[in-house]
Amino acid sequence: MITRYKTGLIWLTLIFAVSFGMPSFAETSGDQDTETSEQDSETSENASSDDSAAGGAAALAKKLSNPIASMISAPFQFNYDTGLGETDADRWILNIQPVFPFELNEDWNLISRTILPVIDLESPTVGGNDVSGVGDIVQSFFFSPKAPTKNGWIWGVGPVISIPIGKDEFTADQWGLGPTFVALKQQSGWTYGALLNHVWGINPPSDRESTNSTFPDVTPTGRQRTDSTFLQPFIAYITPNAWTFNLVSETTYDWNTKQWTVPVIAAVAKLTHIGKQPVSFQVGYRYYFNAPPGGPDWGLRFTATFLFPK
Protein backbone atom coordinates (compact mmCIF):
# COMPACT_ATOMS: atom_id res chain seq x y z
CA MET A 1 0.00 0.00 0.00
CA ILE A 2 2.77 2.46 0.89
CA THR A 3 4.49 1.72 -2.43
CA ARG A 4 1.23 2.45 -4.27
CA TYR A 5 0.81 5.78 -2.47
CA LYS A 6 4.40 6.78 -3.25
CA THR A 7 3.94 5.87 -6.91
CA GLY A 8 0.72 7.91 -7.01
CA LEU A 9 2.47 10.93 -5.50
CA ILE A 10 5.29 10.70 -8.06
CA TRP A 11 2.82 10.61 -10.96
CA LEU A 12 0.77 13.52 -9.57
CA THR A 13 3.94 15.56 -9.02
CA LEU A 14 4.93 14.96 -12.66
CA ILE A 15 1.47 16.08 -13.79
CA PHE A 16 1.82 19.20 -11.62
CA ALA A 17 5.19 19.98 -13.22
CA VAL A 18 4.15 19.64 -16.85
CA SER A 19 0.49 20.68 -16.81
CA PHE A 20 1.11 24.39 -17.27
CA GLY A 21 2.13 23.88 -20.91
CA MET A 22 4.96 25.24 -23.08
CA PRO A 23 5.00 28.64 -24.78
CA SER A 24 4.27 28.73 -28.52
CA PHE A 25 6.34 30.69 -31.04
CA ALA A 26 5.03 32.20 -34.30
CA GLU A 27 6.89 31.47 -37.52
CA THR A 28 7.60 34.31 -39.98
CA SER A 29 7.71 34.18 -43.79
CA GLY A 30 6.44 36.08 -46.86
CA ASP A 31 5.49 39.75 -46.94
CA GLN A 32 6.82 41.63 -43.90
CA ASP A 33 4.04 44.21 -43.59
CA THR A 34 1.23 41.66 -44.05
CA GLU A 35 2.72 39.30 -41.52
CA THR A 36 3.41 42.08 -39.05
CA SER A 37 -0.25 43.09 -39.21
CA GLU A 38 -1.41 39.49 -38.89
CA GLN A 39 0.97 38.88 -36.01
CA ASP A 40 -0.19 42.03 -34.24
CA SER A 41 -3.79 40.88 -34.63
CA GLU A 42 -2.96 37.37 -33.45
CA THR A 43 -0.92 38.74 -30.56
CA SER A 44 -3.83 40.94 -29.51
CA GLU A 45 -6.28 38.04 -29.77
CA ASN A 46 -3.94 35.68 -27.92
CA ALA A 47 -3.31 38.25 -25.21
CA SER A 48 -7.04 38.82 -24.82
CA SER A 49 -7.62 35.06 -24.73
CA ASP A 50 -4.80 34.55 -22.22
CA ASP A 51 -6.11 37.36 -20.00
CA SER A 52 -9.61 35.90 -20.13
CA ALA A 53 -8.33 32.41 -19.31
CA ALA A 54 -6.18 33.72 -16.47
CA GLY A 55 -9.12 35.69 -15.09
CA GLY A 56 -11.35 32.64 -15.28
CA ALA A 57 -8.76 30.46 -13.57
CA ALA A 58 -8.26 33.04 -10.82
CA ALA A 59 -12.02 33.20 -10.27
CA LEU A 60 -12.12 29.41 -9.92
CA ALA A 61 -9.16 29.50 -7.53
CA LYS A 62 -11.04 32.06 -5.45
CA LYS A 63 -14.09 29.80 -5.35
CA LEU A 64 -11.93 26.84 -4.39
CA SER A 65 -10.53 28.73 -1.41
CA ASN A 66 -14.11 29.08 -0.11
CA PRO A 67 -15.09 25.82 1.69
CA ILE A 68 -18.80 26.48 1.06
CA ALA A 69 -18.68 27.78 -2.51
CA SER A 70 -21.55 26.68 -4.73
CA MET A 71 -19.37 24.49 -6.95
CA ILE A 72 -18.90 20.75 -7.32
CA SER A 73 -15.33 19.68 -6.61
CA ALA A 74 -13.49 16.41 -6.07
CA PRO A 75 -10.31 16.81 -4.00
CA PHE A 76 -7.91 13.89 -3.59
CA GLN A 77 -5.64 14.84 -0.71
CA PHE A 78 -2.48 12.78 -0.09
CA ASN A 79 -0.99 13.21 3.39
CA TYR A 80 2.33 11.85 4.61
CA ASP A 81 3.31 11.97 8.29
CA THR A 82 6.44 10.64 9.94
CA GLY A 83 7.90 10.18 13.42
CA LEU A 84 5.03 8.16 14.92
CA GLY A 85 5.63 6.00 17.97
CA GLU A 86 8.81 4.33 19.14
CA THR A 87 9.74 3.26 15.62
CA ASP A 88 9.36 6.74 14.06
CA ALA A 89 6.81 5.16 11.75
CA ASP A 90 5.34 6.65 8.58
CA ARG A 91 1.64 7.17 7.89
CA TRP A 92 0.05 7.70 4.49
CA ILE A 93 -3.53 8.95 4.19
CA LEU A 94 -5.53 9.56 1.04
CA ASN A 95 -8.54 11.73 1.88
CA ILE A 96 -11.27 11.56 -0.75
CA GLN A 97 -13.26 14.76 -0.20
CA PRO A 98 -16.14 15.36 -2.65
CA VAL A 99 -18.10 18.61 -2.30
CA PHE A 100 -21.66 18.96 -3.62
CA PRO A 101 -23.83 22.12 -3.46
CA PHE A 102 -27.63 21.97 -3.47
CA GLU A 103 -29.86 24.98 -4.09
CA LEU A 104 -32.63 25.10 -1.48
CA ASN A 105 -34.32 28.31 -2.67
CA GLU A 106 -33.49 31.78 -3.97
CA ASP A 107 -31.63 32.68 -0.79
CA TRP A 108 -30.03 29.51 0.59
CA ASN A 109 -27.69 26.71 -0.45
CA LEU A 110 -26.89 23.42 1.25
CA ILE A 111 -23.25 22.38 0.88
CA SER A 112 -22.28 18.74 1.44
CA ARG A 113 -18.64 18.03 2.33
CA THR A 114 -17.48 14.42 2.76
CA ILE A 115 -14.14 13.06 3.98
CA LEU A 116 -13.29 9.38 3.41
CA PRO A 117 -9.76 8.51 4.59
CA VAL A 118 -7.81 5.57 3.14
CA ILE A 119 -4.91 4.85 5.48
CA ASP A 120 -1.62 2.96 5.43
CA LEU A 121 0.22 2.94 8.77
CA GLU A 122 3.60 1.43 9.50
CA SER A 123 3.74 -0.20 12.92
CA PRO A 124 4.56 2.46 15.54
CA THR A 125 5.71 -0.29 17.94
CA VAL A 126 8.64 -2.69 17.64
CA GLY A 127 7.47 -6.06 16.35
CA GLY A 128 4.02 -4.80 15.41
CA ASN A 129 2.25 -5.21 12.09
CA ASP A 130 1.64 -2.58 9.45
CA VAL A 131 -2.05 -1.79 8.97
CA SER A 132 -4.01 -0.58 5.93
CA GLY A 133 -7.68 0.22 5.53
CA VAL A 134 -10.32 2.93 5.50
CA GLY A 135 -11.19 5.20 8.40
CA ASP A 136 -14.53 6.59 9.49
CA ILE A 137 -16.39 8.96 7.17
CA VAL A 138 -16.83 12.55 8.34
CA GLN A 139 -19.89 14.09 6.69
CA SER A 140 -20.65 17.81 7.06
CA PHE A 141 -23.66 19.80 5.85
CA PHE A 142 -23.60 23.60 5.73
CA PHE A 143 -26.72 25.72 5.34
CA SER A 144 -25.34 28.89 3.78
CA PRO A 145 -27.01 32.09 2.52
CA LYS A 146 -26.20 32.84 -1.10
CA ALA A 147 -25.47 36.50 -0.40
CA PRO A 148 -22.67 37.61 1.95
CA THR A 149 -23.47 39.82 4.93
CA LYS A 150 -23.36 43.61 4.63
CA ASN A 151 -19.77 43.44 5.85
CA GLY A 152 -18.85 40.87 3.20
CA TRP A 153 -18.74 37.78 5.41
CA ILE A 154 -19.69 34.37 4.00
CA TRP A 155 -20.92 31.82 6.52
CA GLY A 156 -22.53 28.43 6.90
CA VAL A 157 -23.78 26.28 9.77
CA GLY A 158 -25.09 22.75 10.10
CA PRO A 159 -24.46 19.25 11.44
CA VAL A 160 -21.34 17.10 11.24
CA ILE A 161 -21.71 13.32 11.37
CA SER A 162 -19.06 10.66 11.97
CA ILE A 163 -20.02 7.40 10.25
CA PRO A 164 -18.21 4.34 11.68
CA ILE A 165 -17.21 2.34 8.61
CA GLY A 166 -13.48 2.15 9.36
CA LYS A 167 -11.23 -0.79 9.97
CA ASP A 168 -10.93 -1.71 13.66
CA GLU A 169 -7.57 0.05 14.06
CA PHE A 170 -8.91 3.26 12.48
CA THR A 171 -12.49 3.54 13.74
CA ALA A 172 -14.12 5.11 16.77
CA ASP A 173 -16.61 2.22 16.44
CA GLN A 174 -19.55 4.52 17.10
CA TRP A 175 -21.66 7.14 15.41
CA GLY A 176 -20.76 10.74 16.16
CA LEU A 177 -22.82 13.90 15.85
CA GLY A 178 -22.31 17.60 16.48
CA PRO A 179 -22.43 21.14 15.09
CA THR A 180 -20.15 22.68 12.48
CA PHE A 181 -19.69 26.32 11.49
CA VAL A 182 -17.59 28.22 8.97
CA ALA A 183 -17.10 31.94 8.35
CA LEU A 184 -14.80 33.65 5.86
CA LYS A 185 -14.20 36.85 3.97
CA GLN A 186 -12.78 37.36 0.47
CA GLN A 187 -11.35 40.70 -0.66
CA SER A 188 -8.45 42.03 -2.76
CA GLY A 189 -7.13 38.54 -3.50
CA TRP A 190 -7.22 37.47 0.15
CA THR A 191 -9.38 34.78 1.74
CA TYR A 192 -9.38 34.36 5.49
CA GLY A 193 -11.64 32.69 8.03
CA ALA A 194 -12.10 29.60 10.16
CA LEU A 195 -14.00 26.33 10.26
CA LEU A 196 -15.07 24.76 13.56
CA ASN A 197 -16.81 21.56 14.54
CA HIS A 198 -17.37 19.35 17.56
CA VAL A 199 -18.29 15.67 17.57
CA TRP A 200 -19.82 13.68 20.41
CA GLY A 201 -20.11 9.90 20.29
CA ILE A 202 -23.77 8.85 20.54
CA ASN A 203 -23.67 5.05 20.67
CA PRO A 204 -20.32 3.83 22.03
CA PRO A 205 -19.86 0.05 22.22
CA SER A 206 -19.81 -1.53 25.65
CA ASP A 207 -16.00 -1.82 25.65
CA ARG A 208 -15.51 1.89 24.94
CA GLU A 209 -16.04 5.00 26.97
CA SER A 210 -17.80 7.96 25.37
CA THR A 211 -15.82 9.70 22.61
CA ASN A 212 -15.57 13.46 22.91
CA SER A 213 -13.68 14.78 19.92
CA THR A 214 -13.94 17.52 17.39
CA PHE A 215 -13.06 15.99 14.05
CA PRO A 216 -11.84 12.66 15.41
CA ASP A 217 -8.35 11.57 14.40
CA VAL A 218 -8.20 8.83 11.80
CA THR A 219 -6.04 6.74 14.11
CA PRO A 220 -7.86 7.01 17.44
CA THR A 221 -6.19 5.68 20.55
CA GLY A 222 -8.03 3.88 23.31
CA ARG A 223 -11.65 2.80 23.35
CA GLN A 224 -13.49 5.96 24.33
CA ARG A 225 -16.64 7.83 23.44
CA THR A 226 -15.79 10.55 20.92
CA ASP A 227 -15.59 14.05 22.40
CA SER A 228 -13.38 16.23 20.21
CA THR A 229 -13.17 19.79 18.92
CA PHE A 230 -11.68 20.72 15.56
CA LEU A 231 -10.57 24.27 14.67
CA GLN A 232 -9.27 25.20 11.22
CA PRO A 233 -8.22 28.84 10.83
CA PHE A 234 -7.02 29.62 7.31
CA ILE A 235 -5.63 32.44 5.22
CA ALA A 236 -4.88 32.42 1.49
CA TYR A 237 -3.76 34.81 -1.20
CA ILE A 238 -4.78 34.21 -4.83
CA THR A 239 -2.74 35.87 -7.59
CA PRO A 240 -4.26 37.11 -10.88
CA ASN A 241 -2.71 34.10 -12.67
CA ALA A 242 -4.35 31.60 -10.31
CA TRP A 243 -1.54 30.76 -7.90
CA THR A 244 -2.72 30.31 -4.32
CA PHE A 245 -0.49 30.64 -1.26
CA ASN A 246 -2.10 29.53 1.96
CA LEU A 247 -1.46 28.89 5.62
CA VAL A 248 -3.80 26.71 7.66
CA SER A 249 -3.91 24.93 10.99
CA GLU A 250 -5.96 21.76 11.56
CA THR A 251 -6.07 21.81 15.34
CA THR A 252 -7.81 19.11 17.36
CA TYR A 253 -8.51 19.03 21.08
CA ASP A 254 -9.46 15.67 22.63
CA TRP A 255 -11.56 16.33 25.72
CA ASN A 256 -11.02 12.80 27.03
CA THR A 257 -7.24 12.87 27.07
CA LYS A 258 -6.94 16.69 27.46
CA GLN A 259 -4.47 16.72 24.58
CA TRP A 260 -3.93 19.07 21.67
CA THR A 261 -2.83 18.16 18.16
CA VAL A 262 -1.66 21.32 16.38
CA PRO A 263 -0.32 20.89 12.85
CA VAL A 264 0.28 23.97 10.70
CA ILE A 265 0.42 23.58 6.92
CA ALA A 266 2.05 26.02 4.49
CA ALA A 267 1.08 25.25 0.90
CA VAL A 268 1.09 26.58 -2.64
CA ALA A 269 -1.40 25.65 -5.35
CA LYS A 270 -1.87 26.33 -9.06
CA LEU A 271 -5.15 26.12 -10.92
CA THR A 272 -4.71 24.95 -14.49
CA HIS A 273 -6.51 22.88 -17.12
CA ILE A 274 -6.01 19.38 -18.45
CA GLY A 275 -7.80 19.69 -21.74
CA LYS A 276 -11.00 21.49 -20.74
CA GLN A 277 -10.99 20.09 -17.20
CA PRO A 278 -10.00 22.65 -14.54
CA VAL A 279 -7.71 21.10 -11.93
CA SER A 280 -5.89 22.55 -8.95
CA PHE A 281 -2.61 21.02 -7.79
CA GLN A 282 -1.32 21.80 -4.31
CA VAL A 283 1.86 20.90 -2.45
CA GLY A 284 2.50 21.69 1.20
CA TYR A 285 4.62 21.11 4.28
CA ARG A 286 3.09 20.29 7.66
CA TYR A 287 4.77 20.79 11.04
CA TYR A 288 3.28 19.57 14.32
CA PHE A 289 3.75 22.24 16.97
CA ASN A 290 1.99 19.98 19.45
CA ALA A 291 0.95 16.32 19.34
CA PRO A 292 0.05 13.53 21.80
CA PRO A 293 2.85 11.20 22.92
CA GLY A 294 3.83 9.05 19.95
CA GLY A 295 2.29 11.50 17.51
CA PRO A 296 3.91 12.62 14.24
CA ASP A 297 6.67 15.23 13.98
CA TRP A 298 6.13 16.59 10.47
CA GLY A 299 4.54 15.72 7.17
CA LEU A 300 3.83 16.58 3.54
CA ARG A 301 0.66 17.13 1.57
CA PHE A 302 -0.21 16.87 -2.10
CA THR A 303 -3.73 17.58 -3.35
CA ALA A 304 -5.29 17.25 -6.78
CA THR A 305 -8.73 18.87 -6.98
CA PHE A 306 -10.99 18.46 -10.00
CA LEU A 307 -13.48 21.31 -10.41
CA PHE A 308 -16.88 21.17 -12.08
CA PRO A 309 -18.18 24.76 -12.31
CA LYS A 310 -21.67 25.44 -13.58
Regions found by a protein language model. Give the residues of each.
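Bacterial N-terminal signal peptides
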Residues: 10-20
